[in-house]
């Protein structure tokens, strides 16, 4: 009988040791959060980059969709009266989002993707940021563009939302799948 009790006690002790919290501050496999990859893509280019990032990081992919989709006429940057031109000329413009708020609570790292419009993030990105509690999150911008860089857009996001943890952004124009995967995996580790 004593052997049975001793054996049960030893098994219980091993179970407790296996379940005990790691006191070295390391994350256990079950507690790591997956990144959230959110993106706005009017033409599909940024969506392709976002899918690659989500695949590379094992992240959750979600679209930032405006309530009213952009038409080709809306995106005509040569027309000062086009919807995109009017929005970008108005720093207070906040296009409404389609659907409800996203659950960002379970994610520590959030990749935020967008096309560069007028050297900035489209105003729908401001709507997303202002509609979600992103404090304490690591925000990693990525973008696509026909000719502009990402630096000014990140500078403007940092200026508009200084309380948030914005990392340096990455322009993914023409980047290979392997290059995007390598960058995304490193950025998700931050």
Predicted segments with their positions:
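A structural signal for short coil/turn segments at secondary-structure junctions
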Residues: 57, 132, 161-164
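Bacterial N-terminal signal peptides that target proteins for export
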Residues: 1-8
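C-terminal motif of bacterial Sec signal peptides marking the signal peptidase cleavage site
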Residues: 15-18
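Short, glycine-/small-residue-rich phosphate/pyrophosphate-handling segment
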Residues: 140-176
């Amino acid at each position: 009988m004593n052997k049975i009790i001793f054996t049960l006690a030893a098994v219980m002790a091993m179970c407790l040791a296996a379940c005990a919290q790691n006191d070295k501050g390391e994350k256990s496999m079950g507690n790591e959060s997956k990144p959230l990859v959110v993106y706005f893509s009017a033409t599909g280019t940024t969506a392709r980059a976002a899918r690659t990032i989500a695949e590379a990081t094992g992240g959750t992919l979600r679209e930032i969709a405006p309530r009213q989709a952009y038409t080709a006429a809306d995106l005509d940057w040569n027309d000062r009266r086009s919807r995109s031109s009017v929005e970008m000329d108005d720093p207070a413009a906040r296009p409404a989002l389609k659907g409800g708020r996203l659950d960002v609570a379970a994610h520590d790292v959030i990749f935020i993707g967008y096309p560069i419009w007028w050297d900035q993030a489209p105003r729908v990105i401001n709507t997303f940021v202002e509609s979600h509690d992103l404090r304490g999150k690591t925000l990693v911008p990525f973008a696509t563009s026909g000719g502009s860089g990402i630096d000014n857009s990140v500078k403007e996001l940092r200026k508009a939302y200084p309380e948030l943890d914005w990392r340096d952004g990455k322009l993914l124009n023409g980047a290979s799948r392997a290059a995007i995967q390598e960058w995304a995996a490193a950025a998700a580790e931050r």
